[in-house]
Amino acid sequence: MIINHNTSAINASRNNGINAANLSKTQEKLSSGYRINRASDDAAGMGVSGKINAQIRGLSQASRNTSKAINFIQTTEGNLNEVEKVLVRMKELAVQSGNGTYSDADRGSIQIEIEQLTDEINRIADQAQYNQMHMLSNKSASQNVRTAEELGMQPAKINTPASLSGSQASWTLRVHVGANQDEAIAVNIYAANVANLFSGEGAQTAQAAPVQEGVQQEGAQQPAPATAPSQGGVNSPVNVTTTVDANTSLAKIENAIRMISDQRANLGAFQNRLESIKDSTEYAIENLKASYAQIKDATMTDEVVAATTNSILTQSAMAMIAQANQVPQYVLSLLR
Protein backbone atom coordinates (compact mmCIF):
# COMPACT_ATOMS: atom_id res chain seq x y z
CA MET A 1 0.00 0.00 0.00
CA ILE A 2 1.35 3.46 -0.95
CA ILE A 3 0.29 6.86 0.39
CA ASN A 4 2.16 9.45 -1.73
CA HIS A 5 0.01 8.74 -4.79
CA ASN A 6 -3.58 7.73 -4.19
CA THR A 7 -4.27 6.14 -7.57
CA SER A 8 -7.90 5.38 -6.80
CA ALA A 9 -8.60 8.99 -5.79
CA ILE A 10 -6.78 10.32 -8.86
CA ASN A 11 -8.78 8.04 -11.17
CA ALA A 12 -12.07 8.98 -9.49
CA SER A 13 -11.17 12.68 -9.70
CA ARG A 14 -10.38 12.40 -13.42
CA ASN A 15 -13.68 10.68 -14.14
CA ASN A 16 -15.49 13.24 -12.02
CA GLY A 17 -14.00 16.04 -14.14
CA ILE A 18 -15.14 14.32 -17.35
CA ASN A 19 -18.63 13.75 -15.99
CA ALA A 20 -18.90 17.33 -14.72
CA ALA A 21 -17.83 18.70 -18.12
CA ASN A 22 -20.35 16.49 -19.91
CA LEU A 23 -23.06 17.55 -17.47
CA SER A 24 -22.21 21.21 -18.07
CA LYS A 25 -22.48 20.78 -21.85
CA THR A 26 -25.76 18.92 -21.51
CA GLN A 27 -27.18 21.63 -19.26
CA GLU A 28 -26.10 24.25 -21.80
CA LYS A 29 -27.92 22.38 -24.57
CA LEU A 30 -31.04 22.03 -22.43
CA SER A 31 -31.05 25.71 -21.50
CA SER A 32 -30.38 26.98 -25.05
CA GLY A 33 -32.32 24.35 -26.97
CA TYR A 34 -29.42 24.01 -29.41
CA ARG A 35 -27.28 20.95 -29.98
CA ILE A 36 -24.56 23.17 -31.46
CA ASN A 37 -23.67 26.18 -29.30
CA ARG A 38 -20.10 26.62 -30.51
CA ALA A 39 -18.02 25.34 -33.39
CA SER A 40 -16.33 22.73 -31.18
CA ASP A 41 -19.67 21.00 -30.67
CA ASP A 42 -19.91 20.18 -34.40
CA ALA A 43 -17.63 22.12 -36.74
CA ALA A 44 -19.23 20.91 -39.97
CA GLY A 45 -22.74 21.31 -38.60
CA MET A 46 -21.98 24.86 -37.46
CA GLY A 47 -20.80 25.79 -40.96
CA VAL A 48 -23.80 24.28 -42.71
CA SER A 49 -26.33 25.69 -40.24
CA GLY A 50 -24.80 29.16 -40.54
CA LYS A 51 -25.25 29.18 -44.31
CA ILE A 52 -28.79 27.83 -44.03
CA ASN A 53 -29.66 30.50 -41.46
CA ALA A 54 -28.34 33.23 -43.76
CA GLN A 55 -30.48 31.88 -46.59
CA ILE A 56 -33.53 31.76 -44.34
CA ARG A 57 -33.02 35.39 -43.32
CA GLY A 58 -32.60 36.44 -46.95
CA LEU A 59 -35.71 34.58 -48.09
CA SER A 60 -37.71 35.98 -45.18
CA GLN A 61 -36.84 39.51 -46.26
CA ALA A 62 -37.64 38.61 -49.86
CA SER A 63 -41.05 37.39 -48.71
CA ARG A 64 -41.65 40.69 -46.95
CA ASN A 65 -40.54 42.54 -50.09
CA THR A 66 -43.03 40.53 -52.12
CA SER A 67 -45.87 41.26 -49.70
CA LYS A 68 -45.15 44.99 -49.85
CA ALA A 69 -44.97 44.87 -53.63
CA ILE A 70 -48.35 43.13 -53.74
CA ASN A 71 -49.79 45.87 -51.52
CA PHE A 72 -48.21 48.47 -53.80
CA ILE A 73 -49.76 46.91 -56.91
CA GLN A 74 -53.17 46.61 -55.25
CA THR A 75 -53.03 50.31 -54.36
CA THR A 76 -51.96 51.22 -57.89
CA GLU A 77 -54.65 49.08 -59.47
CA GLY A 78 -57.28 50.64 -57.22
CA ASN A 79 -56.31 54.12 -58.38
CA LEU A 80 -56.33 52.98 -62.01
CA ASN A 81 -59.84 51.66 -61.44
CA GLU A 82 -60.94 55.13 -60.34
CA VAL A 83 -59.30 56.68 -63.41
CA GLU A 84 -61.09 54.17 -65.62
CA LYS A 85 -64.44 55.09 -64.06
CA VAL A 86 -63.80 58.74 -64.89
CA LEU A 87 -62.83 57.85 -68.46
CA VAL A 88 -66.00 55.82 -68.91
CA ARG A 89 -68.02 58.84 -67.82
CA MET A 90 -66.05 61.01 -70.26
CA LYS A 91 -66.87 58.55 -73.03
CA GLU A 92 -70.56 58.86 -72.21
CA LEU A 93 -70.31 62.64 -72.44
CA ALA A 94 -68.37 62.49 -75.73
CA VAL A 95 -71.00 60.21 -77.24
CA GLN A 96 -73.70 62.51 -75.93
CA SER A 97 -72.00 65.60 -77.38
CA GLY A 98 -71.64 63.90 -80.77
CA ASN A 99 -75.41 63.74 -81.09
CA GLY A 100 -76.63 66.33 -83.59
CA THR A 101 -79.67 67.18 -81.48
CA TYR A 102 -77.56 69.22 -79.04
CA SER A 103 -76.82 72.91 -79.49
CA ASP A 104 -73.43 74.55 -79.04
CA ALA A 105 -74.60 75.80 -75.66
CA ASP A 106 -75.46 72.25 -74.63
CA ARG A 107 -72.05 71.04 -75.76
CA GLY A 108 -70.48 73.88 -73.80
CA SER A 109 -72.16 72.57 -70.66
CA ILE A 110 -70.92 69.08 -71.44
CA GLN A 111 -67.42 70.49 -71.98
CA ILE A 112 -67.49 71.97 -68.48
CA GLU A 113 -68.03 68.52 -66.99
CA ILE A 114 -65.35 67.09 -69.29
CA GLU A 115 -62.86 69.62 -67.95
CA GLN A 116 -63.81 68.80 -64.37
CA LEU A 117 -63.29 65.12 -65.10
CA THR A 118 -59.87 65.73 -66.66
CA ASP A 119 -58.92 67.67 -63.53
CA GLU A 120 -60.12 64.71 -61.47
CA ILE A 121 -57.89 62.35 -63.45
CA ASN A 122 -54.90 64.59 -62.72
CA ARG A 123 -55.87 64.76 -59.05
CA ILE A 124 -56.05 60.97 -58.78
CA ALA A 125 -52.71 60.59 -60.57
CA ASP A 126 -51.02 63.22 -58.38
CA GLN A 127 -52.38 61.89 -55.10
CA ALA A 128 -51.86 58.20 -55.86
CA GLN A 129 -48.96 57.44 -53.53
CA TYR A 130 -47.47 54.53 -51.66
CA ASN A 131 -44.95 55.42 -48.98
CA GLN A 132 -44.52 58.86 -50.62
CA MET A 133 -43.85 57.26 -54.01
CA HIS A 134 -45.98 58.69 -56.80
CA MET A 135 -47.37 55.77 -58.76
CA LEU A 136 -49.31 57.38 -61.62
CA SER A 137 -47.73 60.78 -62.22
CA ASN A 138 -44.58 62.14 -63.87
CA LYS A 139 -43.11 63.42 -60.63
CA SER A 140 -39.50 62.67 -59.80
CA ALA A 141 -38.89 59.17 -58.55
CA SER A 142 -35.97 60.04 -56.27
CA GLN A 143 -36.69 58.56 -52.86
CA ASN A 144 -34.90 57.97 -49.60
CA VAL A 145 -32.52 55.06 -50.18
CA ARG A 146 -33.15 53.50 -46.80
CA THR A 147 -36.88 53.50 -47.43
CA ALA A 148 -36.29 51.84 -50.78
CA GLU A 149 -34.19 49.13 -49.16
CA GLU A 150 -36.86 48.48 -46.55
CA LEU A 151 -39.52 48.17 -49.22
CA GLY A 152 -37.37 46.15 -51.57
CA MET A 153 -38.61 48.23 -54.49
CA GLN A 154 -37.87 51.59 -56.01
CA PRO A 155 -39.68 53.56 -58.73
CA ALA A 156 -37.75 55.41 -61.41
CA LYS A 157 -38.52 57.16 -64.66
CA ILE A 158 -36.82 55.47 -67.57
CA ASN A 159 -35.79 56.45 -71.06
CA THR A 160 -36.90 53.57 -73.29
CA PRO A 161 -37.70 54.71 -76.85
CA ALA A 162 -38.24 51.12 -77.98
CA SER A 163 -40.97 50.59 -75.43
CA LEU A 164 -43.09 53.68 -76.03
CA SER A 165 -44.80 55.58 -78.78
CA GLY A 166 -46.48 58.91 -78.23
CA SER A 167 -45.11 60.56 -75.10
CA GLN A 168 -46.03 58.15 -72.35
CA ALA A 169 -43.82 58.50 -69.29
CA SER A 170 -43.26 55.47 -67.13
CA TRP A 171 -41.16 54.06 -64.36
CA THR A 172 -40.16 50.57 -63.34
CA LEU A 173 -41.11 48.74 -60.17
CA ARG A 174 -38.22 46.42 -59.36
CA VAL A 175 -38.82 43.86 -56.61
CA HIS A 176 -36.12 41.75 -54.97
CA VAL A 177 -37.83 38.38 -54.57
CA GLY A 178 -34.97 36.01 -53.66
CA ALA A 179 -32.07 35.53 -51.29
CA ASN A 180 -29.44 36.17 -53.97
CA GLN A 181 -28.33 39.38 -55.67
CA ASP A 182 -29.71 38.67 -59.14
CA GLU A 183 -33.17 37.48 -58.06
CA ALA A 184 -35.26 40.52 -58.96
CA ILE A 185 -38.21 41.07 -61.28
CA ALA A 186 -39.60 44.30 -62.71
CA VAL A 187 -42.76 45.71 -64.25
CA ASN A 188 -43.36 49.01 -66.04
CA ILE A 189 -46.05 51.34 -64.73
CA TYR A 190 -47.22 54.12 -67.04
CA ALA A 191 -48.33 57.52 -65.84
CA ALA A 192 -52.11 57.88 -65.79
CA ASN A 193 -52.52 61.65 -65.83
CA VAL A 194 -54.19 63.58 -68.66
CA ALA A 195 -50.91 64.56 -70.30
CA ASN A 196 -49.98 60.92 -70.80
CA LEU A 197 -53.41 59.43 -71.44
CA PHE A 198 -54.22 61.83 -74.28
CA SER A 199 -50.78 62.53 -75.76
CA GLY A 200 -49.71 61.68 -79.32
CA GLU A 201 -51.01 58.39 -80.62
CA GLY A 202 -51.20 57.14 -77.09
CA ALA A 203 -49.96 53.67 -77.98
CA GLN A 204 -47.80 51.65 -75.67
CA THR A 205 -45.96 48.37 -75.90
CA ALA A 206 -44.20 46.15 -73.42
CA GLN A 207 -40.62 46.97 -72.54
CA ALA A 208 -38.26 45.16 -74.86
CA ALA A 209 -35.33 44.69 -72.47
CA PRO A 210 -34.63 44.71 -68.72
CA VAL A 211 -33.82 48.09 -67.22
CA GLN A 212 -30.12 48.36 -66.50
CA GLU A 213 -29.98 52.04 -65.65
CA GLY A 214 -28.91 52.93 -62.11
CA VAL A 215 -27.14 51.24 -59.21
CA GLN A 216 -28.14 47.86 -57.80
CA GLN A 217 -28.58 47.79 -54.04
CA GLU A 218 -29.45 45.02 -51.64
CA GLY A 219 -33.18 44.55 -51.95
CA ALA A 220 -33.72 47.60 -54.16
CA GLN A 221 -32.94 49.28 -57.45
CA GLN A 222 -32.02 52.98 -57.50
CA PRO A 223 -32.31 53.93 -61.18
CA ALA A 224 -31.30 57.34 -62.43
CA PRO A 225 -34.15 59.67 -63.45
CA ALA A 226 -34.78 60.10 -67.15
CA THR A 227 -37.70 60.97 -69.40
CA ALA A 228 -39.48 59.18 -72.21
CA PRO A 229 -39.11 60.66 -75.69
CA SER A 230 -41.98 62.71 -77.06
CA GLN A 231 -43.13 61.73 -80.52
CA GLY A 232 -46.66 63.12 -80.52
CA GLY A 233 -46.17 66.84 -80.16
CA VAL A 234 -48.20 69.02 -77.86
CA ASN A 235 -50.75 67.20 -75.71
CA SER A 236 -54.24 67.54 -77.17
CA PRO A 237 -57.08 68.59 -74.83
CA VAL A 238 -60.32 66.65 -74.68
CA ASN A 239 -62.72 68.90 -76.58
CA VAL A 240 -66.39 68.13 -77.23
CA THR A 241 -67.64 71.61 -78.18
CA THR A 242 -68.34 70.49 -81.75
CA THR A 243 -69.49 67.24 -83.31
CA VAL A 244 -66.15 66.77 -85.06
CA ASP A 245 -64.20 67.46 -81.87
CA ALA A 246 -66.47 65.12 -79.94
CA ASN A 247 -65.77 62.27 -82.36
CA THR A 248 -62.03 62.97 -82.25
CA SER A 249 -62.07 63.10 -78.46
CA LEU A 250 -64.12 59.91 -78.32
CA ALA A 251 -61.33 58.05 -80.12
CA LYS A 252 -58.79 59.48 -77.67
CA ILE A 253 -60.91 58.52 -74.67
CA GLU A 254 -61.38 54.98 -75.98
CA ASN A 255 -57.64 54.69 -76.47
CA ALA A 256 -57.06 55.97 -72.92
CA ILE A 257 -59.52 53.40 -71.57
CA ARG A 258 -57.68 50.69 -73.49
CA MET A 259 -54.37 51.89 -72.02
CA ILE A 260 -55.75 51.79 -68.48
CA SER A 261 -57.30 48.36 -69.04
CA ASP A 262 -54.02 47.01 -70.43
CA GLN A 263 -52.13 48.48 -67.50
CA ARG A 264 -54.52 46.93 -65.00
CA ALA A 265 -54.22 43.58 -66.77
CA ASN A 266 -50.42 43.78 -66.65
CA LEU A 267 -50.48 44.67 -62.97
CA GLY A 268 -52.92 41.84 -62.26
CA ALA A 269 -50.67 39.35 -64.02
CA PHE A 270 -47.65 40.71 -62.15
CA GLN A 271 -49.51 40.44 -58.84
CA ASN A 272 -50.42 36.82 -59.58
CA ARG A 273 -46.77 36.12 -60.28
CA LEU A 274 -45.74 37.80 -57.04
CA GLU A 275 -48.28 35.77 -55.08
CA SER A 276 -46.92 32.58 -56.64
CA ILE A 277 -43.38 33.69 -55.77
CA LYS A 278 -44.43 34.43 -52.20
CA ASP A 279 -46.02 30.98 -51.82
CA SER A 280 -42.92 29.22 -53.15
CA THR A 281 -40.67 31.40 -50.98
CA GLU A 282 -42.65 30.56 -47.85
CA TYR A 283 -42.45 26.87 -48.75
CA ALA A 284 -38.69 27.14 -49.22
CA ILE A 285 -38.36 28.91 -45.86
CA GLU A 286 -40.35 26.15 -44.18
CA ASN A 287 -38.10 23.43 -45.61
CA LEU A 288 -34.92 25.32 -44.77
CA LYS A 289 -36.08 25.86 -41.20
CA ALA A 290 -36.73 22.14 -40.90
CA SER A 291 -33.20 21.41 -42.15
CA TYR A 292 -31.76 24.04 -39.83
CA ALA A 293 -33.57 22.55 -36.85
CA GLN A 294 -32.39 19.05 -37.75
CA ILE A 295 -28.78 20.21 -37.69
CA LYS A 296 -28.78 22.88 -34.99
CA ASP A 297 -31.51 22.07 -32.48
CA ALA A 298 -31.10 19.71 -29.56
CA THR A 299 -33.30 16.65 -29.12
CA MET A 300 -34.62 17.40 -25.66
CA THR A 301 -35.43 13.80 -24.68
CA ASP A 302 -31.90 12.65 -25.54
CA GLU A 303 -30.36 15.57 -23.66
CA VAL A 304 -32.50 14.92 -20.57
CA VAL A 305 -31.34 11.30 -20.55
CA ALA A 306 -27.72 12.43 -20.97
CA ALA A 307 -28.09 15.02 -18.20
CA THR A 308 -29.52 12.43 -15.82
CA THR A 309 -26.75 9.98 -16.65
CA ASN A 310 -23.98 12.56 -16.21
CA SER A 311 -25.52 13.80 -12.97
CA ILE A 312 -25.57 10.27 -11.52
CA LEU A 313 -22.01 9.61 -12.69
CA THR A 314 -20.82 12.89 -11.18
CA GLN A 315 -22.37 12.07 -7.81
CA SER A 316 -20.96 8.54 -7.99
CA ALA A 317 -17.48 9.86 -8.78
CA MET A 318 -17.66 12.24 -5.82
CA ALA A 319 -18.59 9.33 -3.55
CA MET A 320 -15.68 7.27 -4.92
CA ILE A 321 -13.28 10.15 -4.29
CA ALA A 322 -14.44 10.32 -0.69
CA GLN A 323 -13.94 6.57 -0.23
CA ALA A 324 -10.55 6.60 -1.97
CA ASN A 325 -9.36 9.36 0.35
CA GLN A 326 -10.16 7.13 3.32
CA VAL A 327 -7.71 4.40 2.20
CA PRO A 328 -4.51 6.17 3.43
CA GLN A 329 -6.13 6.42 6.85
CA TYR A 330 -5.87 2.65 7.13
CA VAL A 331 -2.05 2.98 7.25
CA LEU A 332 -2.34 4.64 10.66
CA SER A 333 -3.79 1.45 12.06
CA LEU A 334 -0.52 -0.30 11.25
CA LEU A 335 1.40 2.27 13.32
CA ARG A 336 -0.61 1.76 16.47
Swiss-Prot record:
Keyword Protein biosynthesis: no
A cellular component term, taken from the record's GO annotations: membrane
InterPro entries xrefs: Flag_bb_rod_N, Flagellar_basal_body_rod_CS, Flagellin, Flagellin_C, Flagellin_N
Main location: periplasm
Gene3D superfamilies: f41 fragment of flagellin, N-terminal domain
Subcellular location: Periplasmic flagellum; Periplasm
Region of interest: Disordered: 208-236
Impact upon substituting D279N: In strain: B31 and KA
Chain intervals with Low complexity compositional bias: 210-233
Taxonomy, superkingdom: Bacteria
Consequence of substituting A156S: In strain: 212
Annotated keywords: Bacterial flagellum, Periplasm
GO molecular function terms listed in the Swiss-Prot or TrEMBL record: structural molecule activity
Subunit structure comment from the entry: The flagellum consists of an outer layer composed of repeating units of FlaA around a core that contains several antigenically related polypeptides.
Entry's family note: Belongs to the bacterial flagellin family.
Protein's job: Component of the core of the flagella.
Name the UniProt record assigns to this protein: Flagellar filament 41 kDa core protein
UniProt source species: Borreliella burgdorferi (strain ATCC 35210 / DSM 4680 / CIP 102532 / B31)
